């Protein structure tokens, strides 16, 4: 072993030099090695994923990962070995040991840094322990005393002291465990021999030694054998308070028909039916709905698009749907032919059953014996229970609970009578047997009789009372209880009958307890003499062997009124073979052939009226589980018909039919109206019997107590709400109700047929009035017939000429319209320019221009009769316009908005005027400079043309100013918006 490290050192040094040279040659090798180390780290962590909750020391985990990477370091030429990965260990210990392992850390030795030489020597010896330690995991703890005790308990017993109290686990694990351990040892030795020198120089996470006993309690999981099912353990109780348990417990859905918390229940009924009849029908879909769905959206077309992978169960669902569709179509076909009904045909009577054969007689006898054995067993159980209760009562209360029997006179022979009483001859005393606790009777003349225990007890109690009170009845009964000999005897005088009970073997008590026994018997006797209800209940047998009708209450009498009784096997045959052996007492009881046990089912009747259950729940043919929360009213009639309409009579049957149709068809008022109108022929239908969609809707609103206007949806919701409000107001003003509730068919004013004939006269009057108001044709005007003979078919040339003439007429018409439109536009522009020039005063540029403007502007001067508006007038006019368009705003706000707008408009006009004056000055300067340049260029030429006077230029500029677009007056709406923005 000493030569191996010396030879391994130079090899490792040369290997490291080669790796460094390769690393310089291949710069990407480091990246590949790092990627490999990262994946190995992930693999190591995944293999220890089951220890995730138990890993608390991060530094220790890092050291273990570093050691694992060094074992599989490719830089040293070591390939990855799967055996170096940690494996899951299962501790095969007792439940107590498992509990201790959960709370106590078995191995917690402080980390010790070993020297290189010491580690190199101990590595091959502890390689197995190190591998086992890497695979085991424990919960950390700080209790050293508990840890030491647990270590002592896990140490194996010495062989010198004896054999193991338990069989070692290796003997049961088989050869698989041994081969695995050998392979692990060989791998650890090969690892040590190849990299002993490097591992000696590198720091390895110190691992504490594992006791040898741990190897006997660990085994590796074999993949070939399936894991055992875990044992179900009841969870710990979270809440001790029963109230909190009831609140936090989950409600269990029961299949009973009775729910005490159901507010929709009207009443409770009791159903009596056979035990094998299901009390609740399973939830299913109607055949019509299933057939409709299978034809419109079959599963065979939907399944391939809804699932990525098709299985047998999924395909079977589609096949079952096809089968059910075929069955449903066959049922519909039979119903059309009249061969399908809920009532089945008459039961077929087999003619062979009318003859009694040996087999029939044998079956009847077997049936009789079965019933006899069953009832006999019940009777024996009841009798045994009654006897056991009697013995228990005797030893509890004493002789007072015995049955009273008639006393027999002495001197006569008593034989065994028919009722089972024991009799003996006179002059022979009865032999007493102490072992069997028989009753020994001793008298003055030694005559043995059977005495009445209750009579004797009464006499004894009377004698005892006399002795206590007076002390003079020496001839009375004297009781002497001798507990030393174990014999209970009584002696009497004057030929009094005395009875004694031998309790030597059964009651062996000291003499001090005799008083307690006497008190117990006396109290029981006194309480039994006073017949109370409590004493009767205590002495009552546990089973009632008989029952009388008087003991039942009214509800129980109703249940058993028609209940068939079990009479055994009737020897007499019924006269009619097709008659059933029992009479059904309810519609829920199916008429079957034989009797059986009955079950009592308590069921609630649920109210399906609109007051409790919302009518928005559709219970129709299709989509019965879909809820519709929106109520869309039908077409609303005009309000002008409200005062003159005739009342509509709704009977109670009509209301029931209306609710039924609403549950079936939802809020489809047209369909409901069609089903409510029972019109067999095209005869006259009065307004009282007519059921329009709006009348059905209005009646629904009256019946629904929880109706709210917010439930109305759709475009007709507002008009329907207005109608209902006006109808309610009108109905309050009337003495009679428009649609009375609960109308009786015999009421002449509301539901009698005479109202129908009275309404017919009103309908005739309306038809006559309508016929009178219709316009009649005028026969005086002759009708001109069409002249078909004089009509001539035009030629193509004539057709083209007509088209050209028509186009030319259209062109002229369009041109004429354009010219007229242009003339109107010119006139409007001229009038606007003239109006603007009159409204604005001229702006003088100098003295000459002002004089000229005064001369030329005489026509544009304001007339004396024209009214001049001040600033306050303009502001008030604006405020009035604002109040007219928006009456919601106050006058103060309108006045402020008008003032603000007038100021801003005035500022804008001043800015515009200043801008125009500046432009005029710039134009004048440019013209003067242009004239000077022309004079300099042509000094010898003729005089320039006469220059326009400044007055003319100013007039032209003023005209341009007047012709410029003015600021348009805004609307009051714009004024208010600007004020609100500011």
From Swiss-Prot:
Protein's UniProt keywords contain DNA repair: yes
The keyword Phosphoprotein belongs to this UniProt entry's keyword annotation: yes
Basic and acidic residues bias locations: 20-31, 115-124
GO cellular component: NuA4 histone acetyltransferase complex; nucleus
Region (Disordered): 1-31, 115-143, 157-207, 414-440, 768-792, 822-872, 913-982
Polar residues bias locations: 1-18, 842-871
Residues found modified as Phosphoserine: 841
Alphabetical list of InterPro entries matching this protein: Homeodomain-like_sf (IPR009057), HSA_dom (IPR014012), SANT/Myb (IPR001005)
Function field: Component of the NuA4 histone acetyltransferase complex which is involved in transcriptional activation of selected genes principally by acetylation of nucleosomal histone H4 and H2A. The NuA4 complex is also involved in DNA repair.
Family: Belongs to the EAF1 family.
Quaternary assembly: Component of the NuA4 histone acetyltransferase complex composed of at least ACT1, ARP4, YAF9, VID21, SWC4, EAF3, EAF5, EAF6, EAF7, EPL1, ESA1, TRA1 and YNG2. Interacts with SWC4.
Name of the protein in its database record: Chromatin modification-related protein EAF1
Species of the source: Saccharomyces cerevisiae (strain ATCC 204508 / S288c)
Lineage: Eukaryota, Fungi, Dikarya, Ascomycota, Saccharomycotina
């Amino acid at each position: 072993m000493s030569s191996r490290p010396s030879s391994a050192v130079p090899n490792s040094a040369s290997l490291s030099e080669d790796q460094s040279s390769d690393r310089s040659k291949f710069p990407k090798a480091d990246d590949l090695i790092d990627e490999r180390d990262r994946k190995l780290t992930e693999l190591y962590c995944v293999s220890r994923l089951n220890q995730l909750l138990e890993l608390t020391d991060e530094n220790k985990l890092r050291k273990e990962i570093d050691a694992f990477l060094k074992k599989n370091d490719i830089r040293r030429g070591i390939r990855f070995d799967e055996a170096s990965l940690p494996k899951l260990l299962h501790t095969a210990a007792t439940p107590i040991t498992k509990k201790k392992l959960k709370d106590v850390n078995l191995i917690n030795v402080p980390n010790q840094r070993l020297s290189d030489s010491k580690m190199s020597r101990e590595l091959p010896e502890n390689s197995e322990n190190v591998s086992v330690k890497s695979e085991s995991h424990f919960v950390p703890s700080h209790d050293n005393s508990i840890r030491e005790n647990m270590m002592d308990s896990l140490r194996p017993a010495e062989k010198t002291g004896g054999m193991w109290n338990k069989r070692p686990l290796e003997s049961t694990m088989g050869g698989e465990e041994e081969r695995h351990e050998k392979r692990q040892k060989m791998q650890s030795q090969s690892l040590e021999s190849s990299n002993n020198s490097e591992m000696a120089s590198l720091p390895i996470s110190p691992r504490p030694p594992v006791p040898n006993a741990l190897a006997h309690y660990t085994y590796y999981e074999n993949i070939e054998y399936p894991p055992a099912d875990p044992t179900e353990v009841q969870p710990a109780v979270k809440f001790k308070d029963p109230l909190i348990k009831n609140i936090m417990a989950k409600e269990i859905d029961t299949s009973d028909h009775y729910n005490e918390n159901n507010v929709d229940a009207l009443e409770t009924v009791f159903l009596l039916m056979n035990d094998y009849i299901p009390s609740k029908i399973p939830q299913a879909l109607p055949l019509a709905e299933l057939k409709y769905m299978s034809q419109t959206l079959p599963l065979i077309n939907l399944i391939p698009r809804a699932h990525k992978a098709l299985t047998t169960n999924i395909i079977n669902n589609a096949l079952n749907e096809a089968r059910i569709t075929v069955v449903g179509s066959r049922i519909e076909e039979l119903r059309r032919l009249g061969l399908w009904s809920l009532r089945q045909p008459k039961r077929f009577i087999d003619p062979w059953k009318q003859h009694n054969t040996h087999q029939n007689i044998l079956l009847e006898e077997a049936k009789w014996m079965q019933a006899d054995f069953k009832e006999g067993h019940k009777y024996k159980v009841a009798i045994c229970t009654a006897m056991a209760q009697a013995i228990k009562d005797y030893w509890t209360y004493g002789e007072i609970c015995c049955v009273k029997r008639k006393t027999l006179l002495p001197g006569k022979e008593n034989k065994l009578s028919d009722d089972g009483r024991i009799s003996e001859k006179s002059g022979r005393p009865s032999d007493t047997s102490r072992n069997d606790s028989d009753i020994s009777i001793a008298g003055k003349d030694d005559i043995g009789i059977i005495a009445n225990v209750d009579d004797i007890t009464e006499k004894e109690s009377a004698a005892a009372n006399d002795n206590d009170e007076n002390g003079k009845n020496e001839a009375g009964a004297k009781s002497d209880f001798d507990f030393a000999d174990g014999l209970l005897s009584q002696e009497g005088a004057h030929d009094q009958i005395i009875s004694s009970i031998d309790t030597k073997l059964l009651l062996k008590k000291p003499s001090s307890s005799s008083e307690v026994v006497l008190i117990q018997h006396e109290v029981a006797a006194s309480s039994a003499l006073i017949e109370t209800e409590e004493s009767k209940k205590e002495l009552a047998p546990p089973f009632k062997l008989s029952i009388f009708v008087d003991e039942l209450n009214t509800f129980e009498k109703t249940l058993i009124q028609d209940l068939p009784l079990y009479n055994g096997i009737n020897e007499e045959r019924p006269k009619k073979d097709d008659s059933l052996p029992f009479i059904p007492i309810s519609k829920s009881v199916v008429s079957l052939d034989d009797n059986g046990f009955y079950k009592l089912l308590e069921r609630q009747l649920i109210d399906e009226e609109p007051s409790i259950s919302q009518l928005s729940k559709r219970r129709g043919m299709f989509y019965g589980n879909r809820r519709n929360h929106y109520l869309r009213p039908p077409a609303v009639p005009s309000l002008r018909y409200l005062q003159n309409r005739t009342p509509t009579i709704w009977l109670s049957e009509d209301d029931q039919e209306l609710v039924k149709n609403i549950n079936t068809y939802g809020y489809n008022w047209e369909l409901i109206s069609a089903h409510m109108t029972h019109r067999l022929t095209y005869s006259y239908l009065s307004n009282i019997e007519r059921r329009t969609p709006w009348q059905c809707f209005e009646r629904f609103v009256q019946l629904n107590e929880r109706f709210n206007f917010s439930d109305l949806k759709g475009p007709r919701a507002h008009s329907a709400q207005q109608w209902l409000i006006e109808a309610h107001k009108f109905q309050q003003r009337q003495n009679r109700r428009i649609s009375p509730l609960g109308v009786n068919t015999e009421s002449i004013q509301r539901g009698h047929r005479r109202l129908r004939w009275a309404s017919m006269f009103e309908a005739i009057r309306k038809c006559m009035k309508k016929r009178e108001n219709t316009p009649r044709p005028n026969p005086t005007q002759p009708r001109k017939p069409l002249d078909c003979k004089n009509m001539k078919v035009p030629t193509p040339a004539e057709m083209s000429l007509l088209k050209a003439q028509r186009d030319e007429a259209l062109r002229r018409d369009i041109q004429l319209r354009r010219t007229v439109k242009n003339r109107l536009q010119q006139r409007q522009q001229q009038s606007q320019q003239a109006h603007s020039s009159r409204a604005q005063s001229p702006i003088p540029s100098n003295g000459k221009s002002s004089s000229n403007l005064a001369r030329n502007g005489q026509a544009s001067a304001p007339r004396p009769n024209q009214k001049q508006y001040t600033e306050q007038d303009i502001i008030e006019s604006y405020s009035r316009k604002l109040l007219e368009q928006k009456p919601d705003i106050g006058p103060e706000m309108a006045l402020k908005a008008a003032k603000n707008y007038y100021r801003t408009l005035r500022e804008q006009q001043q800015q515009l005027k200043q801008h125009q004056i500046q432009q005029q000055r710039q134009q004048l300067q440019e013209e003067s400079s242009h004239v000077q340049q022309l004079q300099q260029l042509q000094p010898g030429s003729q005089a320039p043309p006469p220059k326009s006077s400044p007055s003319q230029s100013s007039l032209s500029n003023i005209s341009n100013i007047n012709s410029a677009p003015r600021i348009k007056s805004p609307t009051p709406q714009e004024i208010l918006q600007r004020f609100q923005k500011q």
